[in-house]
From Swiss-Prot:
The gene is Bbs5. GO terms for molecular function: phosphatidylinositol-3-phosphate binding; RNA polymerase II-specific DNA-binding transcription factor binding. Pfam families: BBL5. InterPro entries: BBL5, BBS5/fem-3, BBS5_PH, PH-like_dom_sf. GO terms for biological process: cilium assembly; protein transport. Belongs to the BBS5 family. Its main location: membrane. Keywords: Cell membrane, Cell projection, Cilium, Cilium biogenesis/degradation, Cytoplasm, Cytoskeleton, Membrane, Protein transport, Transport. GO terms for cellular component: axoneme; BBSome; centriolar satellite; ciliary basal body; ciliary membrane; cilium. The BBSome complex is thought to function as a coat complex required for sorting of specific membrane proteins to the primary cilia. The BBSome complex is required for ciliogenesis but is dispensable for centriolar satellite function. This ciliogenic function is mediated in part by the Rab8 GDP/GTP exchange factor, which localizes to the basal body and contacts the BBSome. Rab8(GTP) enters the primary cilium and promotes extension of the ciliary membrane. This is BBSome complex member BBS5.
């Protein structure tokens, strides 16, 4: 099983997660912690805390920690600043985050309740940019710019453990002769005749590493995760002793990586935040039974509403007997009540 098969933190948007899911996973690092942040779209008027890690953004209510959000960076489509109406700050500059999870778009608005502080914007935008520019650590890549002058272009924090010449890539009928690099982050192979014919396989994406028989004899076979396309790649390493030694080394490095992954998202704050465990409040179980099979409508408030710039005008609803924001064309109150049915 690849590390990616159990990694959800940067690849999902979740609502009201358990205290266990709010804790950092191996390799996840808390970069910044901002108090007095309002979730203006879903919990307007509720003071909360925003935690920025190298994989996601976590927001939780200070009054009710079980009211929370976990937003993975891989789901973020766009981050902008706009004016929003906060119950605690009035009209103020806010951070807008548009996300897409599976086929559903969610929009989040966060307001810093500390006047004149740009830290909310700088932290989230900078860390997300660091995530976007470090995909070589995490993504399976074919024909990328990983080789320069026959040498591997090392990533920060990357170290080469072995370089093996004369390794055949068995992707074609006759095979391609090339060079094989084993590092603490990934495996890279490139053709000797053409540097651009290459493959970079992060340990994060590796599902299995085995020795199998092929028409070329015994070969190293690497299977990648389903998320990367489920590739099966074969490499011929001679002699057999070197093949066995290499497989043992790769399995060992993969095991070390799985225990403490290097995600490559590097951003240093001047002030170091406390550990995440010290910042999240333990959720107290109410004296009631919770049916986990029931659907939760916690996410309904966050559905992305097109390019809405401001609230629509209030209108009187005879059905409810109070003033409500005018519904979008094609929407009805009855339909909104049935959104989860």
């Amino acid at each position: 099983m690849s590390v990616l098969d159990v990694l959800w933190e940067d690849r999902d948007v979740r609502f009201d997660v358990s205290s266990q899911q709010m804790k950092t996973r191996p390799g996840e690092v808390l970069i910044d912690c901002l108090d007095s942040i309002e979730d203006t779209k879903g919990n307007n008027g509720d003071r909360g805390r925003l935690l920025v890690t190298n994989l996601r953004i976590i927001w939780h209510s200070l009054a009710l920690p079980r009211v929370n959000l976990s937003i993975g960076y891989n789901c973020i489509l766009n981050i902008t600043t706009r004016t929003a109406n906060s119950k605690l700050r009035g009209q103020t500059e806010a951070l807008y985050i548009l996300t897409k999870c599976n086929t559903t778009r969610f929009e989040f608005i966060f307001t810093n309740l500390v006047p004149g502080s740009p830290r909310l914007f700088t932290s989230v935008i900078a860390v997300h940019r660091a995530y976007e520019t470090s995909k070589m650590y995490r993504d399976f890549k074919l024909r990328s710019a990983v080789i320069q002058n026959k040498q591997l272009r090392l990533l920060p924090q990357e170290h080469v453990y072995d370089k093996i010449n004369g390794v055949w890539n068995l992707s074609s009928d006759q095979g391609n002769l090339g060079t094989f690099f084993i590092t603490n982050v990934r495996i890279v192979w490139h053709a000797n005749m053409n540097d651009s014919f290459n493959v970079s396989i992060p340990y994060l994406q590796i599902r299995s590493i085995k020795i199998r028989d092929s028409k070329f004899g015994l070969a190293l076979v690497i299977e990648s995760s389903q998320q990367s396309g489920g590739y099966v790649l074969g490499f011929k390493i001679d002699p057999v002793e070197k093949l066995q030694e290499s497989v043992k080394e790769i399995n060992s490095l993969h095991k070390v990586y799985s225990a403490s992954p290097i995600f490559g998202v590097n951003y240093e704050m001047e002030e170091k935040p406390q550990p995440l465990e010290a910042l999240t409040v333990e959720q107290i179980q109410d004296d009631v039974e919770i049916d986990s099979d029931d659907h939760t409508d916690a996410f309904v408030a966050y559905f992305a509403d097109g390019n809405k710039q401001q609230d629509r005008e209030p209108v009187f609803s005879e059905e409810l007997g109070l003033a409500i924001e005018k519904l979008k064309d094609g929407f009805t109150l009855q339909g909104l009540w049935e959104v989860m049915s």
